[in-house]
């Protein structure tokens, strides 16, 4: 995997994987939709990986989902990615925008503070007072910039925006036009070919500001589910923890048995069923793969910088509390039950599980 050297904490995908994108562009002989930097096949290779071209896999899970998303973005409807928190909706959105437009930074972060100007345009008020309405005083939104350049705009957490803000999306997606009456009669921006919108919404938050039927019709909905394959999830966690640890001046990896503890704990508590079929009480907290990465990373940092020894299941147990004890006091009871039954039984056969069980009991 080629990663651009930079001291920034987080690079956008088009910079982080700049070398991979360059290789894909160089060898891309397939037909491209108007305005696309890569062909649909090359976009797929960028996201799902291509060993022959030394392109790393970046999205783990439902490969046909990626194909459907690419097809949607070639059409006239927007793409709406919905799912539980931590299922890589934003990651998939960023990767699609980086591959298709070469720019994943045209983003509006949905919240109660978003107003219609964030989707259309605003003004530099000093220039507005000095010169009156002019192109120099106008501040384009990320969506307007995407329309002008024929690029992908991203809207995160759309359902957190107020209904009147969501309604502004209807004309943008149907007419692909933004009127600018302040600049004169008939002044407008029409979207260049290649423009489209990727929005995301959490299933747990859909009731915050429910989308209207008219807006829903402008989007093609795709559900991003948690990773079904345990081996895929384990590979993803190991890879992302490795990328994070590359920021530190030390070489450290989670031992295989400790990584297995992380994956099993999260899958058991997420699904409500252990690997042997035993029923497990599910906490209300989101036991997502993203949280599993955070726990694994925290365990490795704890072992490397505080304990000064090899990571064990005990380090995992200490980091797990911050994930489970978030939304409901009853989640503590559910975790105790899991530790007293599932973890205890596994601890008789595994040192990593024994260490996890002991540390979890000590912290109780």
Q: Which residue ranges define each predicted feature?
A:
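AAA+ P-loop NTPase catalytic core and its hallmark functional loops
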Residues: 2-248, 253
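Surface-exposed polar/charged interaction patches
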Residues: 27, 243, 272, 345, ...
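Exposed alpha-helical structural elements
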Residues: 42, 142, 232, 236, ...
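Non-catalytic, well-ordered alpha-helical scaffold segments
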Residues: 67, 141, 163, 167, ...
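Short acidic/histidine-centered micro-motifs embedded in hydrophobic/aromatic stretches
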Residues: 172, 265, 318-322
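A general alpha-helix detector
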Residues: 218, 236, 298-301, 319
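Conserved AAA+ ATPase small/helical "lid" subdomain
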Residues: 234, 241-311
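C-terminal engagement/docking regions of AAA+ P-loop ATPases
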Residues: 304-364
């Amino acid at each position: 995997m080629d990663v651009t050297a930079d001291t920034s904490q987080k690079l956008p995908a088009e910079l982080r994987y700049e070398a991979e994108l360059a290789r894909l562009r160089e060898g891309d002989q397939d037909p491209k939709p108007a305005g696309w930097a890569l062909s649909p096949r090359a976009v797929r290779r960028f996201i799902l990986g291509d060993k022959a071209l030394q392109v790393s896999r970046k999205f783990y899970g439902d490969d046909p989902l990626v194909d459907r998303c690419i097809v949607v973005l070639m059409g006239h409807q927007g793409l709406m990615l919905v799912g539980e928190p931590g299922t890589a909706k934003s990651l998939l959105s960023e990767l699609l925008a980086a591959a298709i437009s070469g720019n994943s930074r045209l983003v509006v972060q949905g919240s109660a503070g978003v107003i219609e100007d964030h989707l259309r345009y605003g003004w530099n008020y000093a220039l507005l007072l000095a010169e009156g309405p002019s192109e120099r005083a106008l501040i384009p939104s990320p969506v307007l910039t995407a329309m002008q350049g024929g690029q992908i705009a991203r809207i995160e957490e759309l359902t957190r925006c107020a209904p009147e803000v969501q309604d502004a999306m209807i004309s943008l997606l149907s007419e692909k036009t933004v009127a600018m009456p302040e600049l004169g009669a008939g002044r407008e921006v029409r979207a260049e070919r290649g423009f489209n919108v990727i929005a995301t919404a959490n299933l747990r938050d859909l009731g915050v500001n429910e989308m209207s039927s008219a807006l829903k019709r402008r989007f093609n909905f795709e559900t991003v589910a948690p990773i079904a394959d345990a081996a895929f999830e384990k590979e993803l966690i190991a890879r992302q923890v490795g990328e994070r640890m590359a920021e530190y001046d030390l070489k450290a990896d989670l031992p295989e048995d400790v990584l297995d503890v992380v994956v099993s704990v999260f899958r058991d508590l997420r699904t409500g069923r252990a690997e042997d079929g035993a029923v497990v009480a599910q906490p209300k907290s989101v036991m997502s793969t993203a949280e599993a990465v955070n726990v694994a990373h925290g365990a490795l940092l704890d072992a490397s910088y505080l304990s000064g020894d090899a990571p064990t299941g005990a380090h995992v147990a200490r980091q797990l509390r911050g994930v489970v004890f978030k939304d409901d006091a009853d989640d503590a009871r559910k975790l105790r039950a899991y530790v007293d039954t599932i973890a205890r039984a596994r601890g008789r056969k595994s040192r990593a599980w024994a260490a996890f069980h002991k540390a979890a009991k000590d912290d109780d």
